[in-house]
Curated annotation (Swiss-Prot):
It comes from Buchnera aphidicola subsp. Baizongia pistaciae (strain Bp). This is Bis(5'-nucleosyl)-tetraphosphatase, symmetrical. Its EC number is 3.6.1.41. InterPro entries: Ap4A_hydrolase, ApaH, Calcineurin-like_PHP_ApaH, Metallo-depent_PP-like. Hydrolyzes diadenosine 5',5'''-P1,P4-tetraphosphate to yield ADP. GO terms for molecular function: bis(5'-nucleosyl)-tetraphosphatase (symmetrical) activity; phosphatase activity.
Length: 278
């Protein structure tokens, strides 16, 4: 049995299949960890969703921002981002099942035995693992609830909240505000300001010497020293810019880059060139 990690697929189904063929992936024994953003941008989002959902317990994925946005579109939430690709996906005959399956997926995964952490955008540097797990479980519970559309409506249509996670406590009166900020951490985070706020606009690589902004993985978090953190979301990151235990998996396949896969047991990388022209 082997354990594989793959970054943002974004509808690049052919590349995913070629990559799995390279390692003779066995869906009955191997385990596939995915950083989310299965859909949008690439041409075959529906095929990706159907394949990944068919893997059962042999896939361990987390939700990305595009996955959450698809759920919001399905629920007809105002201000969720529309595209022709997403609209076509919503017309598929099995969309009800696929959305139900997506709603059951987590935002944050931890394997304490293997010392693995995974979320789509990374780990907020001012949290410990227990705090991150607590926020994730609260949001996951909301998405699994039959009133999930009410929660998403709040997230998408009440945007006047600053991104200071350390000022929020999930068990106090501002619970929904805190959960909105936490969802941004799990699915959209890249940079933090010196005061701990998230910067939600800059997508450039840290090598561009952006003043006053720090990528989340450059802020020391002692609770992560014994863990390996896998994340996606940031296709513009340059190779080897993260600390050794922080592994970036989004290598821009949907932008004409490559789809990357990491095998845990021997720390070996595999790549597949994108079929999309730059």
């Amino acid at each position: 049995m082997s354990t594989y990690f793959i970054g943002d697929i974004h509808g690049c189904f052919n590349e995913l299949m070629h990559l799995l063929e390279k390692v003779s992936f066995d869906a009955n024994s191997d385990v596939l960890w995915l950083t989310g953003d299965l859909i949008n941008r690439g041409p075959k989002s529906l095929e990706v969703l159907r394949f990944v959902s068919s893997l059962g317990d042999n896939v361990k994925m987390v939700l990305g921002n595009h996955d959450v946005n698809l759920i919001a579109l399905y629920a007809s939430i105002k201000n969720s981002k529309k595209s022709s690709l997403m609209n076509n996906l919503l017309k598929s005959h099995d969309i009800d099942y696929l959305i139900y399956w997506l709603r059951k997926q987590p935002l944050f995964r931890v394997d304490h035995k293997k010392k693995i952490i995974m979320s789509h955008a990374g780990m907020y540097p001012y949290w410990d693992i227990q705090t991150a797990s607590c926020y994730a479980k609260k949001i996951e519970s909301m998405l699994c609830n039959h009133n999930y559309d009410t929660f998403l409506d709040f997230l998408y249509n009440n945007s006047d909240i600053k991104s200071k996670l350390y000022e929020c406590t999930v068990f106090k009166n501002r619970e929904l505000e805190c959960l909105k900020l936490a969802l941004n951490v799990f699915t959209r985070m890249r940079y933090c300001l010196p005061n701990g706020e998230l910067d939600m606009t800059c997508k450039q690589s840290p090598s561009k010497n952006i003043s006053s902004l720090l990528p989340w993985f450059f802020i020391k978090n002692s609770c992560l020293e014994d863990y390996c953190v896998f994340f996606g979301h940031w296709a513009s990151l340059e190779k080897n810019i993260t600390p050794k235990n922080i592994i970036s998996l989004d290598t821009g396949c949907c932008w004409g880059g490559i789809l990357s896969m990491f095998r845990l047991e021997d720390k070996k990388w595999f790549v597949q060139e994108s079929e999309i022209k730059k």
